[in-house]
Structures are given as structure tokens and as C-alpha cells.
Amino acid sequence: MRHFKVKAMVQSLDISAITGQQTDAEPSKRSKPSALRRTLQALRQRLTKRNRPKPPDWFLEKFSNTTNTDKIGKGCPAMEDAALSSEIRGSSVLCNRLSVDPTLQSHYRWLAIVSLAVLYNIIFVVGRAVFWEINKSAPAFWYTLDYLCDFIYLLDTLVHMHEGFLDQGLLVRDAFRLRRHYFHTKGWYLDVLSMLPTDLAYIWWPPETCSSLYLPCPVIVRLNRLLRINRLWEWFDRTETATGYPNAFRICKVVLAILVLIHWNACMYFAISYEIGFSSDSWVYNLNGTRNNTLQRQYIYSFYWSTLTLTTIGETPTPENDVEYLFVVADFLAGVLIFATIVGNIGSMISNMNVARVEFQNRMDGVKQYMAFRRVGHELEARVIRWFAYTWSQSGALDEERVLAALPDKLKAEIAIQVHMDTLKQVRIFHDTEPGLLEALVLKLKLQVFSPGDYICRKGDVGKEMYIVKRGKLSVVGDDGITVLATLGAGSVFGEVSVLEIAGNRTGNRRTANVRSLGYSDLFCLAKRDLWETLSDYPEARSTLTQRGCQLLRKDGLLDEQIFADSQRVHDSIEGGIEKLELSVENLNMRLARLLAEYTASQAKIKQRLAKLEMNGGPGTWRLECEPQSRARSGRLYSLQPKRRPRSRPDATAKSSDAAKQNTL
């Protein structure tokens, strides 16, 4: 709103200034614009430019995976009929209203609000249950905060009930399925228990009864609000994952846990002092005196005693009865276990924060030892050390390949495109190239750092890489190494034609100049081998890149047209031969498949005939005995042999029938 008000004010002032000037001065004698008018115009232009939406980037649009159908498809799982677009749109809106995506930033902010309510109950419900002066100071204020937190709990129950979950990799948004899933989780029971109206106990146990004579205070009935602590852990996990400083956040989380434990233990000490009796001995809290009877003194002393006990420092009054001894022993044991764990976690966090520095220092020490062992000159050793220092100052010696190794290739390609977008735009031969080719090439870019005075390439060297300047200055020098012919800055590209190996290149794919780094320079390198490995899967892109490379060579007069034409004819003839060979292989495969089908069909027919003969044949009949079809084709004929039924007695009928069944072909 403030931005639009300022813009409107500037426009109104500008208009008034213009009208005033036109009325005061004649049209033929218009004076020059005043300084105020020029200032207002510049301010209006700046505000308009800032408010103007950023135009879409053509380079990133080629890699965009989101479409309109994807946006529509994010509705209910039952959206399958594309023809019913209106119903799909209506059901999508309805499901989206009844579901919450837990990955959205708005859901994370809501968790932060719920976490504040939970943290309030963790600290003040326990504290107000023991320190009665807190409730007496501002009861209306505390009741307002209590029921505000209850309202947040109620809203969070509705949000939690409609939180989407993943089923077979898809986010479920159907309201009925979300509620059914929620009612079968542990969170449902915790939410219900944390929302029980235990404040109804105030009817029989009024909060006004809280005093030094009646502890704990009635607010202790709200302890069930602490059961919503799982939402606080969820917010901690989300924050630790999303933050750019996870180690610092972990340390803050551990410190918060320590303070909460000390706070609870201080409340326990004050409650035990009440049970034993204030001022009854030297161990319990001494309530005598005006100063000791204040809330500030009571809490600070209890917190101090709790800190000394849990940290096992001691130096507290000696217990005098069994209850005091048991409480102190339990505190010491809890302090040893809890703080040993906490100190160990903090130590590991601090060591993890310095892992990159330690690894980098070890590598640098190893290089130093090697140079000392090989007696490398002091000048070269100093250059190496300066290179290490520059690398650490720029990127912290970050190994990008190792960091991104856990990601799939698709995500790595998208990250690389976002990071190297401006770099790839500078390469002329890659303009309007297939997105798949650029996705494959962007993963093969290697970052190289050159020190002052390092030669990136020399004249006459075989071109095996192309370079893209990311940061720094390069100079193109003559053969004497002194004369500067040109200066290259960020975004400059050189060597892109040499990696294409174009026949007819008068330079013979060799470097035509000496390129030297003026200061520390960061260059992206693309090797010829990586380029051609990628182009093997993109034949059309390969021909396109070759044509663009030829155009660049023709522009500089470095292409021999005759040699290039001859190579193209040879290449076309080879390509034609390969196509004919592929066509012949395809025809042979088709013929082989047809013959195999005929053979399989004939085998099936023969098996059917044999099975039919076996079923129809019986004793005293002629049976066909044949050899396999392969033998029959070799010249062997079928043979007919009579099978006579043997004479047998009536009681041997079963045996003769069994013997007849055993006659085979």
C-alpha cells in the first residue's frame, strides 16, 4: 500500500507541475523542466519499472515441466475424464478447499503459529501452577492468552484433519480419505486429549484460591495442552530442513531444550519446598522477608538452584530429610544423563560445522608436504598456496559433484540449468538447441580456476575443450607474451568451433591465439569427448551444430569449402550405406520372424494330429507310427504296423486293456 500511495502522490505532483507550467508559460515559449519536475519524473519511472512484472525467460521456458493440465490435475484423485472440464475444475476447487498441502509455505507458517501456542503452554502453564503471584498479577491477560491458544488448537485440529498425505507417490486431496487417514493416526488421539475442556474444573476449584497456602494452582488442569508438542517437533524438523544454517538452528534448539528443562526443575523445587514447608530448613526456599516474598526473587532463586543442580555444579544447601535427598539424587542423575547427551550433541554439531574447513586444510597440508618433499621452488609454492586461499574464499572448497551426487539426474540437470543459465546463453552454437541436449551438456560442464599469469591455451595447441568465462579477466596476447590483442570478460566464449572437428577448418582444429589469465579466473570447460558422446544420441542436433560452426568459419574465412564438400559427400555415402544395412537387417529380422511363426504353427498342428490319433486309436486297429517331422523331411517314411489283440481269458480282460493302452507310436 505504501508503494502505491507514493506512486500516486508522485503522479499527482507530476501532473500538477505540468499543468501549472503550461498555464503559467505560453505554448510557444515553454521553459525547460525544473529540477523538481525532473526528480519526480525519475522517481515515477523507477517506481513503474520496479512494479513492472519480469518478462519470462525464453531459455528457462524450454525446460519448464509445468503445464495447464498439470495445474488442473492437482485436484481430486478421481479426476480421470478429460472431457468433463467444468466438473473437473469444480471438483478440483472443492477438494483444494478441503485439503491442505503440507509442503506449502503457508502450512509452514501455520505450524510456526501453533508452535508458539505450544511453547506458551510448555512454559507458562507449569510456571503458573506453582508461582501463584503470576496469576494474581494480571488474571484477565492470562485468561485471554489461554483461550487464544485453545482457539489456535481448535483450528490446528481442523488443519491437521485435512492435511494431504502421499499415497503411491501422489498427494491425496480427497476430504473423506484425509479424515479417515487422520482418525487412524496417533495425532488424532493427541489432538483430542489436548483439547479436552479441563478448564471446567474452575467451577469447583476457583483460580482465586491460589496462594502460598494452597498449591498447586488450578491452572494445572491445563497440563493436557502439552500433548500438542508433536506439532512443535514437526516445525523444528521443517525448519532444520529448510534453513540455510542447520547447525546454528540445532544449537538454538538444544539451548531451548536446556532452558525448558531447567524451568521445569525450578518449578518442581518450588513445589517440593511448599510440600515440605517454606523456611522449614536451609534446603527449602526461604519465604520469610519482604524481598523473598516477591515473584522475581522466588523464580530467580529457583532457576538458579535448578541450574546448579542439573549441571552437577553443586554448591547448594545440603538436604536435611529423605524427600530432599531423593529429589537431589534424581536431579543429579537426570543432569548427568541429559547434559552428557546435550554436550555430546553440541560437540558433534560444532565439529560438523568445521568439517569442510578441516578437509580443505588437510588437502592443502598434503600438497605442502609434497612440494617440500619434491623441493618445489618458493615462487611456485607461493602460487599454489594463493590458489588454495582464493578457492576457499570464493566457494569454501565446495565439491559440487559430491554435494549433488545424491540427487537424480533430472534434478541435477534442473539445478545446473538454473545455475548456468546465463553461461549457456553466451554460446552461439547452442542457441535454439534441443532442451534434451542442453540438459545433458550442462551436467558435463566442469569449473576450473586459473591463477594470475596461467595460460588457458597456447597458439598451435590441439583444441580439446571449449571455455566459458564465468568470472575474471582474460587477455589474448601475441607470441611475445607482452602484446595484448584483446581482453575477455565474464560471459566470453572461445574454442567452441574447435571441439566440433569440422572438416575443412583451415586452422586444423588448433588454437589460433594465446589466452592468459590476468587475475584469478573461473572458467567452465566442456571437453570434446563429452560433447561428442552426448551428440551421438542427438544426430539432428549434431548436424545443426556443424552447420552453425561452418557459418562461423565462413564468417572468418577459415573454411575450405572443397574439403568440407568432399567430407560431406563421404559422410552422406557412409550414412546411406548404414541406412541400407539397417534396412537389410530389418528385412532379415522380419523374414526370420515369419519363418519362426510358420515353424511354430506346423509343430502345433502335428501335435494336435498325434493327440487325436492317440485318443481315437484302440486294440485291433492300425496305428500310425511316424518319426518327427524333421526326420520325415530327410526321406524317412511313415510306417504302418498291425497291432493284434492277443487271445486272453475272460479274467485277463483288464490286463489286456492296460497292455493295449501302453502301445505307443
From Swiss-Prot:
Tissue: Expressed in antennae and the visual system.
InterPro entries tied to this protein: CLZ_dom, CNG_cation_channel, cNMP-bd_CS, cNMP-bd_dom, cNMP-bd_dom_sf, Ion_trans_dom, RmlC-like_jellyroll
Keyword Nucleotide-binding attached: yes
GO cellular component: intracellular cyclic nucleotide activated cation channel complex; plasma membrane
SMART domains: cNMP
Carbohydrate-modified residues: 135
Alphabetical keyword list: cGMP, cGMP-binding, Glycoprotein, Ion channel, Ion transport, Ligand-gated ion channel, Membrane, Nucleotide-binding, Transmembrane, Transmembrane helix, Transport
Sequence ranges of Polar residues compositional bias: 654-665
Residue span of region Disordered: 633-665
The protein's role, per its UniProt record: Approximately 50-fold more sensitive to cGMP than to cAMP. May be involved in transduction cascades of both invertebrate photoreceptors and olfactory sensillae.
Family: Belongs to the cyclic nucleotide-gated cation channel (TC 1.A.1.5) family.
Protein's name according to its UniProt entry: Cyclic nucleotide-gated cation channel subunit A
Highest classification ranks of the organism: Eukaryota, Metazoa, Ecdysozoa, Arthropoda, Hexapoda
